Design a protein with these regions (language model features):
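Core catalytic alpha/beta fold that binds nucleotide/phospho-ligands
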Residues: 1-196
Length: 196
């Protein structure tokens, strides 16, 4: 398993235009509908980086490779044993490769809402995040650095589990993240989780 981190600010206009033009017509339409330039750049950069990596590994021209998506949006390449997954948050893109199914997610550590915690986390996950110090009367208690890091570890693990399995975020509530805490790490102000 390998993973990479890429800042899309490094994507030149020429690279963006070249790789956008090499996307399928459907993908070009999808990317063009994104209102955010950052999101458009992440989509194009993700495709460029994955194709370059797999192209080098298979000794194929990256431009000849086509990334498809299954019914749940999970990316894949036909006739390719290498599995990959991509995620982005703001200007940071992460992508991972493996010989097995893989899921990756990244989130920037920022204040949270208890509503998300209660809606998508099991009781055990809520207890792990809170460390039994959450105080409903004191909203600041759930935005301490330790609580936030725990929250984003669980959240990104749940997303990575769902992405690996291909079920999408509809399985977020049922994904059990606690057994995979060692597959999550902090990188600057971000939490990254990789499930293989």
């Amino acid at each position: 398993m390998e993973y990479f981190i890429y800042n899309i600010e490094n994507l030149t206009d020429a690279e963006y235009e070249k790789w956008f033009s090499l996307m399928t017509e459907d993908k070009q339409e999808k990317v063009s509908r994104y209102k955010s330039l950052t999101r458009r750049k992440c989509s194009v950069a993700g495709e460029m980086l994955v194709k370059n990596h797999i192209g080098r590994a298979l000794n194929l021209a990256p431009e000849s490779l086509i990334i498809l998506a299954d019914e749940n949006g999970k990316p894949y390449m036909e006739n390719c044993r290498t599995k990959f997954n991509i995620s982005h948050c703001e200007n940071i893109l992460v992508y991972a490769f493996s010989n097995e199914e893989i899921g990756i997610d990244i989130e920037k550590i920022k204040p949270i809402s208890l509503k998300v915690l209660k809606s998508f986390f099991s009781e055990n996950e809520q207890e792990y995040v809170s460390g039994n110090v959450l105080n409903a009367d004191n909203p600041e208690s759930y935005n301490s650095p330790e609580i936030l890091e725990r929250f984003y570890r669980i959240y990104t693990l749940k997303e990575a589990i769902c992405k690996k399995s291909g079920i999408g975020i509809k399985g977020l509530k049922d994904a059990d993240a606690l057994p995979f805490l060692d597959q999550s790490f902090k990188e600057n102000d971000y939490i990254i989780s990789i499930i293989k």
